[in-house]
Amino acid sequence: MDLSPRVRAVCDLDVSEVREYAGRHEYDGKPQDLSPAGVRAGLARLAAARADGDQLADTHDEAHLSAAEVQKRVAYAELELHRRNPILHLGELDLACYDRDYAPREERDAARAEHIAAWPRVADAAVGSLDQVSAPAYQRSCGPVVSSR
């Protein structure tokens, strides 16, 4: 089932969760680009889809979709969580979804290999994005902060 542009734009800003928990296997092997440029592009697609898209006929569904759009804007544009929360980047490295028997082994293995091949890009995006991690979080994971003063 194809997704409407608005739903697709929301899903594109939550790739690891959508792949793992919604079973959207078109995202297999394709980690989300959480670099600053990648997030800006995703937010631009979200805004364009919202501006160009029709409201859903069902008011309940429309309310859920609108709330999801707001959540993505708050998470990525206002709070910039991709710049301060390493877990978002770690989620893009997760390969566990390929362990389930949702498709033939060969298809899952190919998706896993494609996903692993993208790891350098995911790591580069994390390095380029994570410039607002709090010092206590950094110290717990990496050791003491060295000051140049």
Model-derived features: positions:
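N-terminal maturation segment of proteins
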Residues: M1-R149
